[in-house]
């Protein structure tokens, strides 16, 4: 098979294989499986929406099957001599979990965010407040923005002013998170507990120096590997690099033979291929994908690979939503064949399928059986007793039948 010119089917199979959809492990999921998956996909995006399950848990389930979520919690938000912390939070894509070993690869971004990611002027103009927040965290240990604010009010009761409200304490703490001076020690519920970064990150990692150029080169290399192949725009998006960073990095990797430049039929830009990635001959991969799954989080690539137009509709008023509030694309044998609007009702013990829709040209009855199986597995994983099917969409009837007739 020529590797210099690929059709979209080949590109799609490469992308799915690179993202680790080979099938769940034969044994129960362990910390070693999690470590291997992170080294492959690099990031687990964090998001506050928990209508079905929080976003960072879902890509692990989609690739490895049911697992104990405390495995991921412990990897990200706890540390002991026996089980050292594996993951750390940072702006790796959006807010995301990434390998703690890769912290030094983000130093250039921390310098860029020296005064935070947002409200930079406010942070820049209030250096004394920055120092006070750092001193508060040093004194308190792991703490929320609210606890920092309460501490500062106690320590300086006469200093009440426009700054002393929760949101601005939060701005400062978030700015210090972005600049790498604070990090997340743990989360309780989903509330972030800040700590001084050097107290969370092992000294050998914290002190490791990586030049900006070397870091960007390595991130580009990792993005190509995680994607399998992608255009410059796809690769750039994975770690949210700038155009001025990605162009020289890709050129250097092509020159070194670490990345192959290829043409994909119908794409109007060249693609870059991981030379270690074989081209699968068979379409594989069946999974429900959360909206922030790395396979689909860059929507233009999803359209090119799958001919699948996808937009999250959380912020769309309910009457104007086409498919639903929190819609999971359904990957069946390497094709995106449908969409499922899911909601977990924990009080009732049900996983509610609010709506289920087949893509144009797809047979709803062919989708229903494998979808029922995945939904039942997901419900069990989330500790829910059953799947309840609503009324919206052309897949709900055959799905209801499939759920009743198979066990």
Language model features by range: what are they?
Residues 1-407:
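Long, charged, low-complexity, helical-prone intrinsically disordered regions
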């Amino acid at each position: 098979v020529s590797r210099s010119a690929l059709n979209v089917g080949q590109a799609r199979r490469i992308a799915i294989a690179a993202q680790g959809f080979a099938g769940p492990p034969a044994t129960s999921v362990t910390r070693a499986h999690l470590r291997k998956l992170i080294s492959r996909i690099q990031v687990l995006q964090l998001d506050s929406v928990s209508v079905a399950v929080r976003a960072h848990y879902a890509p692990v389930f989609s690739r490895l099957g049911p697992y104990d979520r405390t495995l991921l919690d412990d990897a990200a938000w706890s540390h002991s001599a026996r089980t050292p912390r594996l993951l750390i939070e940072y702006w790796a894509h959006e807010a995301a979990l990434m390998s703690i070993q890769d912290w030094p690869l983000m130093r250039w971004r921390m310098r860029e965010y020296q005064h935070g990611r947002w409200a930079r002027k406010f942070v820049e103009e209030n250096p004394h407040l920055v120092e006070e927040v750092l001193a508060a965290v040093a004194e308190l240990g792991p703490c929320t923005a609210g606890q920092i604010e309460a501490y500062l009010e106690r320590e300086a009761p006469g200093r009440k002013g426009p700054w002393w409200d929760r949101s601005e304490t939060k701005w400062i703490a978030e700015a210090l998170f972005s600049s790498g001076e604070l990090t997340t020690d743990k989360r309780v519920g989903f509330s972030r507990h800040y700590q001084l970064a050097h107290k969370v990150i092992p000294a050998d990692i914290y002190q490791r120096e990586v030049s900006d150029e070397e870091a960007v080169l390595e991130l580009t290399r990792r993005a190509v590997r995680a994607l399998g192949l992608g255009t410059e725009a796809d690769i750039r998006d994975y770690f949210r690099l700038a155009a001025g960073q990605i162009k020289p990095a890709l050129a250097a990797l092509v020159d070194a033979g670490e990345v192959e430049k290829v043409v994909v039929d119908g794409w109007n830009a060249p693609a870059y291929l991981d030379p270690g990635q074989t081209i699968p001959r068979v379409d594989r991969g069946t999974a429900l994908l959360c909206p922030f799954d790395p396979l689909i989080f860059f929507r233009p690539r999803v359209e090119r690979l799958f001919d699948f137009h996808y937009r999250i509709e959380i912020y769309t008023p309910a009457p104007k939503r086409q498919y639903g509030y929190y819609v999971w694309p359904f990957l069946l044998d390497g094709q995106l064949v449908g969409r499922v609007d899911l909601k977990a009702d924990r009080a009732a013990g049900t996983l509610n399928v609010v709506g289920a829709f087949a893509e144009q040209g797809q047979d709803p009855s062919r989708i229903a059986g494998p979808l029922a199986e995945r939904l039942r597995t997901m419900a069990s994983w989330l500790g829910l007793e059953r799947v309840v099917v609503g009324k919206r969409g052309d897949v709900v009837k055959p799905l209801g039948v499939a759920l009743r007739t198979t066990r």
